[in-house]
């Protein structure tokens, strides 16, 4: 399998394969927070994120969600369909936390009556600014039809994920998704789903996600290992 580096990100490297429509995502042991300001190498993180994301994407595929995931090929690598990423971070919030609480001056932990979908312009130089539908169209990131589909699909994914995490005693607080266009021009779910890009709280309100690293609350891999062990209990 020919492996040439296409892109090196904070959490993953993207490599070519012999098929121009398939790439390898190689998960790193690097942890970052605050848009890369806080950075640390944490042994075992890449393997855990690859395991967790592979399992979640397998379940999403089985539930009828169109994703880029093909299969896990090693402890830290997976095969994905190549997509043209839409430079949007799509955030869904079930409970107030993090930047939402800071932005609106509300305490963390308030259950929202209806999940809120937010868009952020994926641009490191601009610190990924919070934008609305009109900005998305002005920047020509997506049209009305694309926006409606992305929002509806994000809400559908939220229902699936919230149920799965509830089954293993975890509450899905919020999460970030990325979408892209496949070779046929269809929008599909891309990137990853792991404790790196979601918030999970246990029954006691303990953080079971990257906030452990972001806020200096403990060992990241210890928490991710617990999430991985719990996920394997899913039917």
Curated annotation (Swiss-Prot):
It is an enzyme of class 6 (ligase). Keywords: ATP-binding, Ligase, Nucleotide-binding, Purine biosynthesis. PROSITE patterns: SAICAR_SYNTHETASE_1, SAICAR_SYNTHETASE_2. Pfam families: SAICAR_synt. InterPro entries: SAICAR_synt/ADE2_N, SAICAR_synt_PurC, SAICAR_synth, SAICAR_synthetase, SAICAR_synthetase_CS. It catalyses: 5-amino-1-(5-phospho-D-ribosyl)imidazole-4-carboxylate + L-aspartate + ATP = (2S)-2-[5-amino-1-(5-phospho-beta-D-ribosyl)imidazole-4-carboxamido]succinate + ADP + phosphate + 2 H(+). Pathway: Purine metabolism; IMP biosynthesis via de novo pathway; 5-amino-1-(5-phospho-D-ribosyl)imidazole-4-carboxamide from 5-amino-1-(5-phospho-D-ribosyl)imidazole-4-carboxylate: step 1/2. One of its GO terms (molecular function) is phosphoribosylaminoimidazolesuccinocarboxamide synthase activity. GO terms for biological process: 'de novo' IMP biosynthetic process; cobalamin biosynthetic process. Its EC number is 6.3.2.6. The keyword Translocase does not apply. Transmembrane segments: none annotated. Belongs to the SAICAR synthetase family. This is Phosphoribosylaminoimidazole-succinocarboxamide synthase. It comes from Streptococcus mutans serotype c (strain ATCC 700610 / UA159).
């Amino acid at each position: 399998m020919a492996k040439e580096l296409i892109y090196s990100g904070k959490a993953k490297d993207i490599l070519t394969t012999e098929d121009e429509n398939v790439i390898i995502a190689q998960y790193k042991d690097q942890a970052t927070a605050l848009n890369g300001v806080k950075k640390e190498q944490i042994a075992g993180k890449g393997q855990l994120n690859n395991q967790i994301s592979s399992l979640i994407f397998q379940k999403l595929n089985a539930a009828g969600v169109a994703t880029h995931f093909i299969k896990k090929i090693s402890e830290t690598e997976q095969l994905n369909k190549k997509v043209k990423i839409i430079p949007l971070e799509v955030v869904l919030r079930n409970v107030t936390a993090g930047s939402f609480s800071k932005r609106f001056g509300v305490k963390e932990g308030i259950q929202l009556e209806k999940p809120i979908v937010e868009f952020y312009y994926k641009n490191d130089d601009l610190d990924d600014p919070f934008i609305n539908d009109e900005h998305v169209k002005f920047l020509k990131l997506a049209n009305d039809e694309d926006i409606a589909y992305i929002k509806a699909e994000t809400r559908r994914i939220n229902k699936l994920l919230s149920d799965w995490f509830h089954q293993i005693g975890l509450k899905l607080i919020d999460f970030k998704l990325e979408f892209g266009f496949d070779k046929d021009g269809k929008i599909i779910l891309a990137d990853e789903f792991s404790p790196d890009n979601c918030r999970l709280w246990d029954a006691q309100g303990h953080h079971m996600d990257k906030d452990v690293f972001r806020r200096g609350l403990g060992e990241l891999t210890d928490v991710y290992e617990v999430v991985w062990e719990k996920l394997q209990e899913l039917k």
